[in-house]
């Protein structure tokens, strides 16, 4: 796996909840490229629980949406916005776990619409949450601005 350098790190005003390394309230994700997949290894924290020692479903959705955005960024060399996200919660995630792993890849491309599949695994490599995200992507010229 190859670590992806965050191109916005150090940019004034950059405070993304998903990936800004200095956003104390954020989830501060980091990403790696592994073949066709984008991967993130993330440490659950107690402040993100919904129920006692259980990772909040909304935080799980944030993690899945964010990794899908990085698939668009890295694999298509552009940016976009989420237009639809279907999420399936299969198993709870313990906030005391040492880590979770997220993996995402492109399923389909139709012009500027990209379908991305993402999975969230617990420390035992069990699929806990799955998402299919539909992204509306921007032309590269617009994304650079």
PLM regions with names:
Residues 39-65:
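A conserved, well-ordered hydrophobic junction motif at loop->secondary-structure transitions
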Residues 41-43, 86-88, 103-105, 119, ...:
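Residue-level recognition of well-ordered beta-strand positions that form the cores
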Residues 57-77, 117-118:
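N-terminal short leaders/motifs
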Residues 67-101, 106:
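Hydrophobic beta-strand-centered segment that forms part of the acyl-chain substrate-binding groove
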Residues 1-47:
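Non-catalytic linker/capping segments at the edges of enzyme domains
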Residues 1-8, 94-96, 105-145:
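HotDog/MaoC-like acyl-thioester-processing domains
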Residues 36, 81-83, 100, 114, ...:
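Hydrophobic core residues within well-ordered beta-strands of beta-rich domains
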């Amino acid at each position: 796996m190859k670590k992806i350098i965050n191109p916005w790190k150090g940019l004034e005003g950059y405070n993304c909840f998903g990936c800004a390394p200095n956003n104390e309230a954020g989830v501060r994700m980091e990403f790696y490229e592994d073949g066709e997949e984008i991967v993130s290894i993330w440490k659950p924290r107690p402040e993100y629980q919904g129920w006692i020692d259980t990772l909040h479903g909304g935080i799980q959705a944030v993690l899945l949406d964010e990794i899908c955005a990085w698939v668009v960024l890295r694999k298509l060399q552009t940016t976009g916005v989420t237009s639809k996200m279907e999420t399936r919660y299969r198993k709870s995630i313990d906030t005391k776990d040492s880590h979770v792993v997220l993996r995402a890849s492109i399923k389909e491309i139709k012009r500027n619409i990209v379908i991305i599949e993402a999975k969230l695994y617990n420390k035992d490599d069990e699929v806990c949450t799955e998402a299919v995200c539909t992204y509306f992507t921007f032309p590269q010229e617009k994304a650079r601005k």
